Amino acid sequence: MTIWVNQKEHLYDAPLTLVDLVKQLGKAKKTGIAIAVNNSVVPKNNWGNLMLNDQDKVTIITATQGG
């Protein structure tokens, strides 16, 4: 199935949860991450329950520090 992550196409085998996607992208241990699926923010405690579907659009935002 095709999942769009930050406007880039990625191909995955189904089924795939949001937490599976985060792990495959190497972001599982990072903090300060917010994720929206199809323009709806998903609370972190729901990442393991949300099944992704073909053509879903995932936006991952990572907080950064600076000055």
Task: Label every PLM stretch briefly.
Residues 1-66:
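Ubiquitin-like/PB1-type beta-grasp interaction modules and other compact soluble beta-rich domains
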